[in-house]
């Protein structure tokens, strides 16, 4: 039992070998004190500053109406900042918007593919739009079809595809010109879990090839799995920033929960007193639960060993155990007080953005 527990508590974080950028990295995205105020006086973005290094995968989280959509539309040149500056790949979004657009891929919440066309036809149109040299188009199309695993259906109309397949095709269309930076705005909203997981794999492939990815998402486990770093937005301001692990460390420690077979109050009191008396657990918190006990400790593996020694000495039979670690949901709740996941922007925010787009 103890060996199984140690295996459970030693599982790696959702994304291992995170490469947090250093000051030596060149910046792919440089936003400095960005404000965006709408015509009605509403300030949707209030002093956002972001440094995103080349090759980084950044997650951008926030509750409804926090300003996520407004921020990303400003970064991709669909809105001008009212105050502050934004540089993408070294180009200023206000004075050099066309250069910015040519150097990025932008996947909006709404699918941009033509469902009446095939993947191959959609990609060919995208190549023409982005000015991919004609002698390179066929090779790029085949490479992208392989990347998103649509080669076998490359000549079937996209309207026959599942939502996940359409998202994968949409992903491919924003990559035809090989942009060094890709912006993904709620890319997996509405997909079932299996489809989301497959799309995640393709995003990881894109990032592993050196592409910088800026992701807004309503799925916190998505950010945990994919992102090197996360920024949390509320009321148009960034209120927290860091790696998923560092943010989770701020809200608590791991919890070991043990259920006894046929527990009695007397038995639980006796065991809890014995566990609290263990010197190696002086930094742990031990509490009674309806079925047994719960132990919160900085080192849950060490705590588990001590707890199981006490239970063995007390001849207490165990029916189940579990280890819970802090999640980004816990971080999000502690920061925003919102018990819902970071969700899609409000209709008001999207409507305002649509009426104040930068002229192309």
Predicted feature descriptions by range:
Residues 1-35, 338-360:
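ABC-family P-loop ATPase nucleotide-binding domain
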Residues 27-31, 36-221, 225-234, 239-240:
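ABC transporter nucleotide-binding domains
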Residues 155, 286-288, 323:
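Hydrophobic/anchoring residues in structured secondary elements
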Residues 201-296:
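ABC transporter nucleotide-binding domain
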Residues 316-324:
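Conserved short beta-strand edge segments in small beta-sheet-based binding/regulatory domains
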Residues 331-339:
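Short, low-order "capping/linker" segments at domain edges
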